[in-house]
Every structure is written in structure tokens, then in C-alpha cells.
From Swiss-Prot:
This is Heme exporter protein B. NCBIfam families: ccmB (TIGR01190). The chain crosses the membrane at residues 21-41, 45-65, 101-121, 128-148, 159-179, 193-213. Pfam families: CcmB (PF03379). Required for the export of heme to the periplasm for the biogenesis of c-type cytochromes. Belongs to the CcmB/CycW/HelB family.
Length: 220
């Protein structure tokens, strides 16, 4: 099926540019590490501010990786070829965003036990953090994809991309950190996780169509 061919192709291309995959991950880890060094290793304080630290770091590292979502395709001319495929353009966008999450969002999940240890979180707090990252990081990709499509042809589109995308991530940031706060106090988190799941479902449904329209505008 052509959808999965595009998905596998995107993964192969991403692994050929391993430095661009590693840089956001290093940025994420460096930001997480700086907080214990700057405010001290007090476990209670670190556990209290951990949700904000983790999600701001995840958001900023995702923005670093988002810029290359369509950039290479535009530079080598393959973006126009993708638009001419018999597969609908929203499906192409969905395959690209899924592959992008596999190489940028999934590694954050793998690093989550280390992050929990650095910030003095308990096992339950780590489990909830992992769930928020599982639901939230693909949502970041879907929220950012239309902005990337609009700025793909600009030489210095990184700042504009941040201005477009960051306000859209505020609800995600609120509910993800609220879930982690509730977990730290051993309160129910199901409602927050349900909202994060709804945000993921909504963005996964609507974002490919908005991104496809933005790509057509940028290419014209």
C-alpha cells in the first residue's frame, strides 16, 4: 500500500540524517539536566516543578525537529511529486507526521525513565508522564504540521513557525501538566488523559487536511 511505502521511506530518510534526530533529543536532555543544577537537587522541589520542566522541554525540542518535516522535500523537488501521487495529499501528510513522530516523539518516551530519575519522580508519576508524552507528542506534530507547511518556502521561517504553533499548544500544555500534577498528589488522572486523547484524535483528523491546503498554497 502506498501509504506504508511513504511511511517507510520517511523513516529511511530520517535515519540517514541521524544528527537531525539526535539534536532535539540532546536539547531535551540538556534542558532537563540544567534545572537540577540551577535550583538544587532538593527532591520535593524538583518533583513539584517536574511537569512544567518536562513539557516545556518536550515542546521546544519538538519545535526544533518540526522545521525539517517538509523542508528536504521542497529542496529536492519531491514535494511536488508527492502532491501528484494518486494517494490523497492528506494521507501523505498523515504518513509523514507519523514517521516524524517515530523518530522524534518515540525517543522521548524511551528517555522518560531517565528523566523521571533525574527529577525525583516516583513510579506512578513516571507512568503518567509516559502516558502524557504518548498522547501529547504526536499531537504536537499534528498541531505544528500546518505551520510548517505555511512556512516551508521561507528562508527564516523558524521564528514565524514558533509564533504560529506555540499558541496552539497551550491547551495541550495545560492538561498534560495537570495530569502530572494530579499524579504527584495521587489524584485521579483519567479525565486529563481522556482530554489529551480527544486532542490527539481531533488533531489527527483535521490537521492532515489543513496541512494539505497549506502546502498547496505554499507551492503555488
Amino acid at each position: 500500500m502506498m501509504f506504508w511505502r511513504i511511511f517507510r521511506l520517511e523513516l529511511r530518510v530520517a535515519f540517514r540524517h541521524s544528527a537531525e534526530i539526535a539534536n532535539p533529543l540532546w536539547f531535551f536532555l540538556i534542558v532537563i539536566t540544567l534545572f537540577p543544577l540551577s535550583i538544587g537537587p532538593e527532591p520535593q522541589l524538583l518533583a513539584r516543578i517536574a511537569p512544567g520542566i518536562i513539557w516545556v522541554a518536550a515542546l521546544l525540542s519538538s519545535l526544533l525537529a518540526l522545521e525539517r518535516l517538509f523542508r528536504d522535500d521542497l529542496q529536492d523537488g519531491s514535494l511536488e511529486q508527492l502532491m501528484l501521487l494518486p494517494l490523497p495529499l492528506p494521507a501523505v501528510v498523515l504518513a509523514k507526521v507519523m514517521a516524524h513522530w517515530m523518530v522524534t516523539g518515540l525517543p522521548l518516551l524511551i528517555l522518560s525513565p531517565l528523566v523521571a530519575m533525574l527529577l525525583g519522580m516516583d513510579v506512578y508519576g513516571w507512568q503518567v508522564m509516559a502516558l502524557t508524552l504518548l498522547l501529547g507528542t504526536p499531537t504536537l506534530g499534528f498541531l505544528g504540521a500546518p505551520g510548517v507547511a505555511l512556512t516551508v518556502g521561507l528562508k527564516r521561517g523558524g521564528v514565524l513557525l514558533s509564533i504560529l504553533v506555540l499558541p496552539l499548544t497551550i491547551p495541550l500544555l495545560i492538561f498534560a501538566t495537570a495530569a502530572m500534577d494530579a499524579a504527584s498528589m495521587h489524584l485521579p488522572v483519567e479525565g486529563y488523559l481522556a482530554i489529551l486523547g480527544a486532542l490527539l484524535a481531533g488533531t489527527a483528523t483535521l490537521s492532515p487536511f489543513a496541512t494539505a491546503a497549506a502546502l498547496r498554497i505554499s507551492i503555488q
